[in-house]
A protein has these predicted regions:
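Membrane-proximal intracellular helices of multi-pass ion channels
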Residues: 1-479
Length: 479
């Protein structure tokens, strides 16, 4: 294990976190809020500490798989630990455990909150809270790679560990250039949504914070009723951008390079839009009697379907009051998640497709043991390692889901509350059902349960492996 390499990466993360905190500081200056100075002080401490750590240059810089996974996991933990401090210093979230929960929820783009009154926060803290979504959406190390060379070509192992999905696609030969392209696309989508929201009457502060939550698929609102208080037009704009943010960013690269035909060849994207269309239409018809018109039912249905499948977590209505069938569909969408290579969470549609294709193959092998049948995705054969990795991921995923549900049951809340609390944090969604529904929060859980849910949020965002590897004794042995 090259500890100097990992330390250097953590130092860079701290430097960038210090720079990130300038945004809430400037916001506080605009609104004349003294809380802004807390962010400035912690930002300076992060930057100076990061500079001190990176003073010593790394000899023979190289990131192997082991260093990549450890560096990514520790980077997200360090980012969250320091990111939570301003909430405590300002006194807006006095408990450090609660502040850490809120911060991890932000960076992992989960959007689960312990706050019962979001509107009590200052503009300064609301901006930081939402901006963590944008930083975590595409990945903090991917962001840093787009600016700094870090460790040269070996940074592909960092991107593999941080990027969502069963595999990572290089858009261009160099990792740094791939990171730059991804963030360019990310920034363009962000700017377009901000402009559209402002044009249709949303205040600039609201536009910025809600766009960070939409494009990063986070879901932290700045009002207690989430998105319900905005006009139908604004809700529809957010619906569109939530759905677009759940698309594999390779599709946008095809648009940039004028390869539009390639988009329609991507099986995952076709299935993604098919699920949204089918689920949205069914739910709209199912909840028709709850709203004044069919159009209103469709608006709420497609908003919530888009919000849940992309793991954004915004809400225009209390969907916990919907019929059981509609709620069950939303729970299924929680597990399915968005496309691989997007900012969305969940199990990912690509993995689901691989499993769905593997099942008939396995059944066929039972009858015809000597049959050679190749599983294909987008016309290309899926290699054995990807298939095995998907199966193992599924097993670990449900193991964590069940164990976490068991652990937080010590707080004695009902099964629906506990199961959907774990599902919503592990899949980085935010709201669940019943006690953690869209009009509730996670504040009622004990500190022990909050730590379990924090683990789930980090595990879900980092695709399980980086966080779990930290608990392997063999990892830390010096050879």
């Amino acid at each position: 294990m090259k500890y100097s390499t990992i330390g250097y990466i953590l130092g860079q993360v701290l430097k960038f976190e210090g720079i990130f905190m300038l945004l809430p500081f400037l916001t506080g200056m605009i609104y004349h809020e003294n809380e802004a100075y807390s962010y400035l002080i912690i930002g300076i401490i992060c930057f100076v500490l990061g500079c001190l750590i990176t003073l010593k240059k790394v000899k023979h810089p190289q990131i192997f798989n082991r260093e990549g996974f450890v560096a990514v996991a520790l980077s997200w933990i360090v980012l969250s630990i320091f990111g939570a401090i301003p909430f405590v210093i300002t006194g807006e979230i006095p408990s450090y455990v609660d502040a850490l929960f809120e911060t991890i929820s932000g960076f992992t783009t989960t959007g689960a909150s312990i706050l019962s009154n979001v509107e009590a926060l200052t503009h300064t803290s609301l901006m930081w809270r939402s901006f963590t979504h944008w930083v975590g959406g595409m990945g903090v190390l991917v962001f840093i790679m787009s600016f700094l060379p870090l460790m040269g070509g070996s940074t592909i192992n960092l991107m593999k560990a941080e990027s969502p999905g069963p595999s990572v696609s290089r858009l261009v030969p160099h990792v740094k250039d791939t990171a730059k392209i991804l963030y360019r696309i990310y920034l363009v989508i962000t700017i377009i949504e901000i402009v559209l929201l402002c044009i249709f009457g949303m205040p600039m502060f609201d536009s910025l914070t809600l766009t960070f939550g939409t494009v990063g698929t986070g879901g932290f609102g700045i009002h207690n009723d989430s998105i319900a208080g905005y006009s139908p037009v604004l809700q529809n704009i957010i619906t569109v951008f939530m759905i677009l943010s759940g698309v594999n960013y390779v599709a946008y690269f095809y648009i940039m390079t004028k390869q539009l035909k390639e988009i329609f060849k991507v099986e995952e994207i076709r299935v993604y839009f098919g699920i949204i269309l089918g689920a949205g239409t069914f739910i709209a018809l199912n909840i028709r009697s709850l709203y004044g018109s069919l159009g209103e039912a469709f608006r709420h249905a497609f908003f919530q379907v888009g919000s849940i499948i992309t793991t954004c977590g915004y809400a225009t209505t209390d969907f916990d009051l919907w019929p059981e069938t509609s709620k069950m569909i939303l729970v299924l969408l929680m597990f399915i998640g968005a496309c691989a290579g997007s900012t969305g969470g969940g199990f990912k549609i690509s993995r689901l497709l691989i499993l769905c294709k593997a099942i008939p193959k396995q059944l066929s092998l039972v009858i015809h043991p000597r049959e050679v049948k190749v599983i294909r995705m987008d016309g290309k054969p899926i290699d054995h390692n990807t298939l095995r990795s998907t199966n193992v991921y599924l097993a670990i995923y449900f193991f964590i889901l069940l164990v976490s549900t068991l652990l937080i049951s010590v707080d004695n809340f009902n099964l629906t509350t506990n199961l959907t609390a774990v599902a919503s944090t592990l899949n980085n969604i935010g709201p669940g059902l019943d006690g953690v529904g869209p009009t509730r929060n996670f504040g009622m859980y004990s500190d022990f349960s909050k730590f379990v849910l924090m683990f789930d949020m980090l595990a879900g965002r980092l695709e399980l492996y980086p966080l779990l590897i930290l608990f392997m004794p063999s990892l830390w042995r010096r050879k």
